[in-house]
């Protein structure tokens, strides 16, 4: 499948094809996110807290 973009990747593992935690707050978690947490910012936003494959640094539209 296509990898979700991520503006700001946080912790990544050290493999050649790293899995990362994305720090972005999004209206809904991407399909395949294993640990989606709601973040209260006044409007319901979500953050994927599991290690996933992303296109890091790709501007998200």
From Swiss-Prot:
Any one GO MF term held by the record is:
serine-type endopeptidase inhibitor activity
Show the GO cellular component annotation of the record.
Answer: extracellular region
Classification via Pfam families = Bowman-Birk_leg (PF00228)
Gene3D superfamilies, sorted:
Cysteine Protease (Bromelain) Inhibitor, subunit H (2.10.69.10)
Marked site: Reactive bond for trypsin: 14-15
Q: Which UniProt keywords apply?
A: Disulfide bond, Protease inhibitor, Serine protease inhibitor
Q: Which domain of life is it from?
A: Eukaryota
Q: What tissues contain this protein?
A: Expressed in bulb (at protein level).
Q: Which SUPFAM superfamilies match?
A: Bowman-Birk inhibitor, BBI
- GO annotation, biological process: negative regulation of endopeptidase activity
| Recorded family membership | Belongs to the Bowman-Birk serine protease inhibitor family.
The protein's role, per its UniProt record: Serine protease inhibitor. Inhibits trypsin (Ki = 41 nM) and weakly inhibits chymotrypsin (Ki = 410 nM). Does not inhibit bacterial subtilisin.
Protein name, per record = Bowman-Birk type proteinase inhibitor B5
Q: Origin organism of this chain? A: Hyacinthus orientalis
């Amino acid at each position: 499948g296509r990898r979700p973009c991520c503006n700001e990747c946080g912790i990544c593992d050290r493999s050649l094809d790293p899995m990362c935690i994305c720090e972005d707050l999004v209206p809904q978690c991407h399909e395949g996110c294993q640990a989606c947490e709601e973040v209260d910012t006044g409007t319901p936003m979500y953050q994927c807290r599991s290690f996933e494959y992303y296109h890091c640094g790709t501007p998200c539209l």
